């Protein structure tokens, strides 16, 4: 049995793994770690990060690697090398845009510095938000004939793209107006 471990909140990094496995009805156990417990538990995990997956009593980590594993098990990864490149680009895009917004989140959550968080978030909106979503839209436009799925059939790429777009359009990220997606009409249509 597969065991997935993450914090006690939903986030795309764990959700894409759970959605892959659930989509194909692959059983798994889900363990949530409370944020207050994390400093004590951190050293128990590879790279000191979550998510972690345990298979056959061995720990594995890094979101992209775990996503490939779960997607392969769930038949949501491809065997065609060029389709794999498209899927991996979407997974890497998700990680990159998260890396760009992360400083504004850390300023609020860890440092409790709301003024710094607001400044960093505004910089992200001005410099990165539209840019990174236009990158994703261009990938969809150039890789998909039907504009419904990145590889023209449902895959982990679609799960990851949908989940990250959902996060940015959820209203949970301060200062980010969900209407930003109007600037990328192909992507907006894909998401809706």
Predicted ranges, named:
Residues 87, 149-188:
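GST superfamily/GST-like fold recognition
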Residues 1-123, 127-130, 142-144, 153:
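GST-like domain detector, emphasizing the conserved glutathione-binding G-site
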Residues 125-136, 164, 190:
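Alpha-helical packing segments of well-folded alpha/beta enzyme cores
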Residues 139:
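Extended, charge-enriched "interface" segments that sit outside catalytic cores
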Residues 83, 121, 132, 183-190:
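Alpha-helical structural motif
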């Amino acid at each position: 049995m597969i065991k997935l471990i993450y914090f006690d909140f939903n986030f795309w990094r764990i959700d894409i793994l759970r959605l892959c496995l659930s989509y194909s009805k692959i059983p798994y156990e889900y363990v949530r770690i409370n944020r207050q417990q994390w400093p004590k538990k951190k050293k128990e995990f590879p790279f000191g990060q979550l998510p972690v997956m345990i298979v056959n009593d061995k720990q594995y980590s890094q979101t992209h690697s775990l996503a490939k594993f779960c997607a392969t098990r769930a038949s949501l990864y491809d065997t065609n090398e060029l389709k794999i490149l498209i899927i991996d680009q979407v997974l890497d895009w998700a990680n990159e845009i998260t890396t760009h917004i992360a400083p504004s989140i850390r300023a609020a959550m860890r440092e409790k510095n709301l003024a710094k968080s607001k400044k960093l978030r505004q910089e992200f909106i001005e410099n990165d938000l539209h840019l990174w979503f236009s990158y994703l839209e261009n990938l969809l436009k150039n890789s998909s004939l039907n504009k419904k799925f990145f590889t023209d059939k449902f895959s982990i790429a679609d799960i990851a793209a949908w989940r990250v777009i959902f996060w940015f359009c959820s209203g949970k990220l301060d200062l980010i107006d969900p209407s930003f997606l109007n600037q990328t009409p192909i992507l907006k249509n894909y998401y809706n």
